[in-house]
Amino acid sequence: VSQEQIGVTTTGQPIFDYATGRDNFMLTNSDREAKSTSFSLVARHDYDFGLDWMVGYAFTDAEDISPMTSSTAGSNFDNLATNTIVNPEPGISNYNTPHRITARLSYGKEFFAGYESRITAMFYRKQGQGQSHVMGSVDLEGDGAFGRHLLYVPGPNDGNVVVGPDFDVAAFQAFIEREGYGQGFVDRNENNAAWSSRLDLRIDQEIPTFLGASKGRVYLKIYNVMNMIDDSKGLQYDAQFFSQQVVDSNVNAQGQYVFNTFTDRGLTDLLENQSLWEMRLGIQFEF
């Protein structure tokens, strides 16, 4: 509530600045509607000779008004990628995973009478969550020290943008083509982090306990088998936590965006610890 609109850019984007104090926030419910669509499919079958399998697919297209990634009002406000800082519009949710495939294959057999041996493989492949490419917020809101305004992609002879002498036009064009952006403002979380895949393996062997009705088993779990075989495989990815500012920009007196410098930044964050393979050997007793 401490910022008021003082003008617009040549694109019609509102420009805000502090008018009544600084960093005063009023939390209320939005009058905008965020929508979501999701569905899932599962197929499975069990065979009488000990084999069973399952394959599933899930699709999600979910919006939110604010991802609420912080425990404080200030950073929740500052970290939202948007072009409307007051009463922001719905956008693709930071937590949206568009596509996820899961599969399980298991086989059990009694090689020793009364004691089952079983091997189970679990696999998933999922698309990364979305994140936003942004430009500078200088001259677009009070402070504006951290860029969080959605990137504007100029078209040919676009009068909304002035390019500075240090701006790498060729690198920027290559970036736009790689990311698949069209002319105009990119959408919030329009692009996604890289896909991740993982294969886990579990081997169980039932064993006698000689303790009445109790049961025992020895198990071996291998998490991320692909990474165990090849350390360049099975890598786990997530979207960068913060929006990625690729253009250092400001607004001139005519309301045009001035693109000063370009920095190529991707949206994908490698989760190193989760990408490592792990093996566990244990004994389980059930009384």
Identify the meaning behind each predicted range.
Residues V1-G130:
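Gram-negative outer-membrane beta-barrel transporters
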Residues K35-T37, T97-I101, W195-L199, S275-M279:
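Residues that define the transmembrane beta-barrel architecture of outer-membrane proteins
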Residues V42, M54, R104-S106, R202-D204, ...:
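Outer-membrane beta-barrel architecture
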Residues S66-T72, S132-V138, D231-Q236:
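Outer-membrane beta-barrel translocator domains and adjoining extracellular loop/strand segments
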Residues F112, R118-F210, R217, F242-Q274:
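Extracytoplasmic gating/loop element in the C-terminal half of outer-membrane beta-barrel translocons
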Residues K215-V251:
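Aromatic sugar-binding interfaces of carbohydrate-active proteins
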Residues N273-F287:
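Outer-membrane beta-barrel "beta-signal"
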